[in-house]
């Protein structure tokens, strides 16, 4: 089974958590694209979706799924999204696709976060994947200096502007043993919009695509 086939297995398995008549929170990325395809097969059974990115919105609308503004929805039953890394405590690094802030907002209004990944994303300690930080452009240099003080090596992600008009710093060489503490510290730096650590709001369900199919941990 290829990596993409494992992603597909995880994405389609998440359909079991979609309630009839509900509005579904939808993340961003290659694994989520498989979930969106799956969602398209039951589009007449759901009310619609709240999307975490312009890219996911376009894909949802192309399949005829109504996309609601996050401001018009007070609560979601589920939010389905991938991760760049996930540890045994279900803390995650997200933001490889630069949609981390909107992902964090949609996750915040969801009762249940269903994380869909392939087996390569599971780690014991977060930090091998560079940690994305969304930053207001004028604060980029200042935030980078502060991230160095926290032990990281920040690199400006050239040519990338987020859906919110901001820039991304990818922080390398961080062994993240206390994800909640680090999330709070980085979010406290002036000019940071958010960090791609999802520890205060981790996953509730993890669906992992494996060569044997989807493995579900609740």
Curated annotation (Swiss-Prot):
The keyword Aminoacyl-tRNA synthetase does not apply. InterPro entries: NagB/RpiA_transferase-like, Ribose5P_isomerase_typA_subgr, Ribose5P_isomerase_type_A. GO terms for cellular component: cytosol. GO terms for biological process: D-ribose metabolic process; pentose-phosphate shunt, non-oxidative branch. It catalyses: aldehydo-D-ribose 5-phosphate = D-ribulose 5-phosphate. CDD domains: RPI_A. It holds the Pfam family Rib_5-P_isom_A. Substrate binds at residues 28-31, 81-84, 94-97, 121. The active site is at 103 (proton acceptor). The keyword Isomerase applies. GO terms for molecular function: ribose-5-phosphate isomerase activity. Its EC number is 5.3.1.6. Pathway: Carbohydrate degradation; pentose phosphate pathway; D-ribose 5-phosphate from D-ribulose 5-phosphate (non-oxidative stage): step 1/1. Keywords: Isomerase. Homodimer. Belongs to the ribose 5-phosphate isomerase family. Catalyzes the reversible conversion of ribose-5-phosphate to ribulose 5-phosphate. This is Ribose-5-phosphate isomerase A.
């Amino acid at each position: 089974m290829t990596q993409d086939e494992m992603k597909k297995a995880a994405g389609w398995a998440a359909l079991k958590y979609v309630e009839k008549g509900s509005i579904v929170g939808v993340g961003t990325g290659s694994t989520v694209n498989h979930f969106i395809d799956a969602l398209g097969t039951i589009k007449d059974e759901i009310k619609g979706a709240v999307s975490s990115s312009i890219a996911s919105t376009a894909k949802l609308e192309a399949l005829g799924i109504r996309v609601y503004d996050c401001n018009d929805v007070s609560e979601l039953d589920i939010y389905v999204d991938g991760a760049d890394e996930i540890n045994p405590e279900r803390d995650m690094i997200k933001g490889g696709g630069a949609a981390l802030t909107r992902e964090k907002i949609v996750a915040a209004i969801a009762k249940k976060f269903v994380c869909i990944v392939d087996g390569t994303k599971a780690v014991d300690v977060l930090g091998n994947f560079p940690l994305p930080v969304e930053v207001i452009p004028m604060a980029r240099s200042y935030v980078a200096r502060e991230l160095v003080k926290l032990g990281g090596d920040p690199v400006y992600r050239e040519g990338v502007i987020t859906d919110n008009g901001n820039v991304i710093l990818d922080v390398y060489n961080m062994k993240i043993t206390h994800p909640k503490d680090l999330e709070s510290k980085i979010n406290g730096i002036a000019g940071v919009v958010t960090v791609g650590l999802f520890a205060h709001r981790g996953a509730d369900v993890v669906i992992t695509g494996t060569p044997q199919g989807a493995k579900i941990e609740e």
